[in-house]
């Protein structure tokens, strides 16, 4: 299935879930109706407007010369390695989130934070914002065990060339593998 078709289906599912979860106003309990002017729900009584929930999150490619740090999530049945990622907190910039998430999840300091690109991720109502960063100091990894099951440095040669291109994380890993991230 072409990627754009898959994303259209996933996005449709995201909108369906949003509509199903916002039938009634959280302020006064009245029925919500679809706005005629924009993608929003409007309370039929108090006029409160609710927009689709989109949570910003970062995904971070941590590089150390010719190596990249990949981690495996401790939650769920994740068997593949991916990039370090996490949600932006209230009052936090994307760059601050990058530094905090990397320090929390793998105990590393990073520098030279460079924006790569973003991707809507409808599975979790998220907008993923991708960054490449460089290790700043010691490369010893200390994982946050409730978040990360395993993390380690991979050389380009150790990275598979058949990664699924559906997620931004895997696209960024492939970009690093092909040495196109600079």
Where are these regions (language model features)?
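The catalytic Nudix box helix
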Residues: 82-117, 131
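Active-site proximal loops enriched in glycine and acidic residues that flank catalytic Cys/His/Asp
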Residues: 72-73, 85, 114-119, 135, ...
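Nudix hydrolase/Nudix homology domain
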Residues: 1-22, 78-81, 123, 145-182
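Active-site-adjacent beta-strand/loop module that shapes the phosphate/pyrophosphate-binding cleft
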Residues: 119-142
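N-terminal strand-loop-strand
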Residues: 40-83, 87, 109-110, 133-137
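Cys/His-rich short segments
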Residues: 11-61
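Short glycine/proline-enriched turns and hinge-like loops at secondary-structure junctions
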Residues: 37, 54-55, 82, 125-126, ...
């Amino acid at each position: 299935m072409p990627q754009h078709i898959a994303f259209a289906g996933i996005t449709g599912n995201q909108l369906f879930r949003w509509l199903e979860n916002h039938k009634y106003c959280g302020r006064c309990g009245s029925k919500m109706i679809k706005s005629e002017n924009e993608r929003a729900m409007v309370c039929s009584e108090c006029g409160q407007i609710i927009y689709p929930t989109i949570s910003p999150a970062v995904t971070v490619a941590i590089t150390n010369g010719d190596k990249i740090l990949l981690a495996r999530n401790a939650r769920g049945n994740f068997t593949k390695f991916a990039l370090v990622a996490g949600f932006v907190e209230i009052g936090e910039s994307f760059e601050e989130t990058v530094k905090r998430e990397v320090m929390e999840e793998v105990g590393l300091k990073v520098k030279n934070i460079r924006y790569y690109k973003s991707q809507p991720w409808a599975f979790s109502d998220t907008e993923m914002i991708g960054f490449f960063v460089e290790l700043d100091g010691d490369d010893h990894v200390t994982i946050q065990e409730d978040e990360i099951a395993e993390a380690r440095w991979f050389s380009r040669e150790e990275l598979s060339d058949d990664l699924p291109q559906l997620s931004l994380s895997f696209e960024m890993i492939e970009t690093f593998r092909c040495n196109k991230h600079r």
